[in-house]
């Protein structure tokens, strides 16, 4: 009888892709993949370990599995992902009920590890060189069938002083265009209509292979794949967002005019101490240029409040910048003092409560901005993907092209004929409900 394996995948889409590759390898090697961990022979907790909140979530999930193991509901626990890589020794020593810890560079050993724990081996640790996984064969998608993430690179070479990712996942390494395009075609042939391009920094793609950014050429090639309706790009580093990249967005109908540009801050001194380049003036010029070239662009950004040494004046500068720029989408995180990062040793650490309060202020501001921008959508017709049907309200729900999965809003709409999950329809917006839109198919 084949062994049952379940997975709990946490964190970002990049980690989710790693999990999908592991699931595919397990299935190809005779394991039965189950969505319900109850009764599983092995539960893999694919963790994030990027910031404190992510670590807490990962540990809570591991401890939940420990309880199930004690109750006899599951047999074995394997921990993978960033937490496993970053705290390889601590996981087994602090949580001895864990049977195996698999580092990012050893994900391809997942089948062997699961075989070993099922046969009774304990305290397994396996780690290897931090490289891209071989992506031969299909992935077992954990997303709905109509969209998928595609990872074009691994690791990061930006070395922001607050970030542990380079130490966890290594320097930036691009996949070859041939590998990416082959995978994208396989996904499209399997019914994927929205392809979401991810890496720690998508604007760095190709620099290590060709000596220059190859993202525009890659996106152009992806747009020629039959069956893809939308190509969405996340994690665009602002200082490398060139005119060529902007023009590629502006001139290609398949690439949705949605730019995810994490700026983190606008104050020049804070950016310098973050080891990020640019200034408020340069960021303003970039955003202005993007909006001039792509009038209907949706801009998403991410900010950090309470970085070491951030004064009230510097925070006020950030607050005013947010009001002035009016980002369409914005996420704000209180600075997390991560051990092993340069910023963790900086003097003038900001009190944790102040960090959080500043983040709350930014998000309150952004809500007011978003509410106004959302009302501006009333009367517009937008292309949407159908994600499901709500019998309680007798309406469908989905996303507009302006919204990425999981992190942005949704739209509910009625239709005079039956729709299926993954269909693309034009919806006229006639009302809003906080972050979400309401409309009808035309």
Predicted features by range, described:
Residues 8, 80, 198-200, 234-236, ...:
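Generic beta-strand/beta-sheet core signal
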Residues 1-205, 244, 259, 281-292, ...:
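Proteins enriched for Cys/Gly/acidic motifs involved in redox and nucleic-acid/cofactor modification
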Residues 77-81, 86, 189-315:
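Conserved SAM/AdoMet-binding glycine-rich loop
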Residues 12, 206-227, 273-277, 337-368:
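Radical SAM enzyme [4Fe-4S]-AdoMet core and its adjacent flexible, acidic
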Residues 160, 180, 197, 233, ...:
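Conserved, mostly hydrophobic/aromatic
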Residues 345-442:
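Terminal RNA-binding accessory module
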Residues 5, 42-43, 148, 195, ...:
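Conserved beta-strand core positions
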């Amino acid at each position: 009888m084949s062994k049952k394996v379940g997975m709990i995948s946490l964190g970002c889409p990049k980690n989710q892709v790693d999990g999908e590759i592991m699931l595919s390898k397990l299935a190809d090697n005779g394991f039965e993949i189950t969505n319900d961990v109850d009764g599983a022979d092995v539960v893999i907790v694919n963790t994030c370990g990027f910031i404190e909140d992510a670590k807490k979530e990962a540990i809570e999930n591991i401890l939940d599995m420990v309880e199930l193991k004690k109750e006899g509901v599951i047999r074995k626990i394997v921990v993978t992902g960033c937490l496993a890589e970053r705290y390889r020794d601590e996981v087994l020593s602090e949580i001895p009920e864990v049977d195996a810890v698999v580092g990012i560079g050893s994900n391809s050993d997942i089948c062997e590890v699961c075989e070993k724990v099922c046969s009774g081996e304990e305290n397994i640790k396996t780690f290897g060189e931090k490289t891209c996984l071989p992506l031969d064969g299909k992935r077992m998608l954990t997303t709905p069938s109509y969209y998928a993430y595609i990872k074009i690179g691994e690791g990061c070479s930006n070395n922001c002083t607050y970030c542990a990712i380079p130490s966890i996942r290594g320097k930036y390494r691009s996949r070859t265009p041939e590998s990416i395009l082959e995978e994208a075609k396989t996904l499209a042939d399997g019914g994927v209509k929205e392809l979401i391009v991810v890496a720690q920094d998508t604007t760095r793609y190709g620099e290590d292979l060709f000596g220059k950014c190859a993202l525009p050429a890659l996106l152009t090639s992806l747009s020629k794949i039959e069956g893809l309706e939308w190509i969405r790009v996340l994690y665009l580093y602002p200082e490398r967002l060139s005119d060529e990249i902007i023009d590629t967005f502006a001139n290609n109908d398949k690439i949705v005019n949605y730019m995810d540009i994490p700026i983190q801050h606008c104050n020049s001194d804070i950016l310098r101490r973050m080891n990020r380049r640019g200034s408020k003036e340069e960021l303003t010029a970039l955003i202005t240029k993007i909006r001039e070239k792509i009038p209907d662009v949706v801009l998403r950004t991410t900010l950090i409040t309470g970085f070491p040494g951030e004064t009230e004046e510097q925070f006020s500068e950030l607050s005013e910048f947010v009001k002035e720029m009016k980002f369409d989408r914005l996420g704000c995180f209180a600075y997390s003092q991560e051990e092993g990062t340069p910023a963790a040793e900086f003097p003038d650490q900001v009190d944790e409560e102040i960090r959080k309060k500043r983040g709350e202020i930014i998000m309150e501001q952004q809500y007011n901005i978003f509410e106004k921008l959302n009302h501006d959508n009333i009367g517009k017709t937008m292309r949407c993907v159908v994600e499901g049907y709500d019998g309680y309200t007798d309406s469908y729900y989905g996303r507009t092209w302006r919204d990425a999965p999981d992190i942005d809003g949704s739209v509910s709409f009625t239709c005079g004929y039956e729709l299926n999950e993954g269909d693309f329809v034009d919806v006229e917006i006639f009302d809003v409900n906080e972050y979400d839109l309401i409309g009808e198919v035309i």
